[in-house]
Amino acid sequence: MTVPGALRSSVVVFVAAMLQVVIVSALVIGGGALDLLLIVVVSLGLLRGSLPGAVFGFAGGLVVDLLTLDTLGITSLVLTLAGFWAGRYGETTGRDRRKAPLVAVGAITILAGVFGFLLHYLLGEDVVARHALVTALVPTLALNLLLALPVHALVRRSVGEGPAVEPVREVEVVV
């Protein structure tokens, strides 16, 4: 990735993190809230690959953790994995497919919700499973899917297309 591309991507992640904390997280619709930063990180992972996706996920999650004064590292870890998963999906299946952002955002929203719940539970925080995994996750999934394609198009326009990566066809284990 070039330096100007990395700077543009960093600005997009920072703006998305600020919007997430200041505006978007306060808009609760049907019990769930849109996760704009997750959609942006997934889009960057699809466009740039697994390593940049993980880096931008960590950076965006760290900004959110610092601004909300939540348990430091939970959002960072969840978004790091989300960016990595999206990048691997883009590298292995072809990021040019029209439905790739929808599939990635849908699957990663569910995985991030479950993983976030498990992290909070393992840290001993009071989390109600029904609320975290049903009441909040289902509307969040619907909202994320609703805005996945427009946000992905906006991110692609802002940061440009990533380098052409040929899909991985096989993996060799070296001993």
Give the residues covered by each predicted segment.
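Terminal, non-globular segments
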Residues: 1-175
